[in-house]
Amino acid sequence: MKAFALIFAFAFTAQADPPDSFFRALHLVETSGKTGPILGDRGRALGPLQIHRGYHKDSGIAGDYSRCSDLAYSRRVVAAYLKHYAPIAWRNGDVHTLARIHNGGPNGASKRATLIYAAKVRLLSHRP
């Protein structure tokens, strides 16, 4: 029984959600660290993490889309979206895959167009 408990405990401690630096890096890449009701992508994205309406809806987070102007709320939306579409990458703290899905949607990890974006996020997430 002790062996099972140790294996069970190890399984949960071996997994790591993405570091806080992941969100800081997303914020820097998306809006250079600006906050507030920033419109981007020709008015189709809102806030410091540049969230689209469909992304917000897919996240399942309650609240009006306009709340995406708030950084803390936006982080909750991004976390819920990524946990839904990339649960393994989320549990493993796979910044590269998470950035690609944030940028390119549910299939973003397989889109070449997301590679440069993910490289920027990964680079910035490793800075102190």
Q: What kind of region is each of these model predictions?
A:
Residues 16-128:
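Catalytic glycan-binding domains that act on GlcNAc-containing polysaccharides
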Residues 3-13:
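Sec-dependent N-terminal signal peptides
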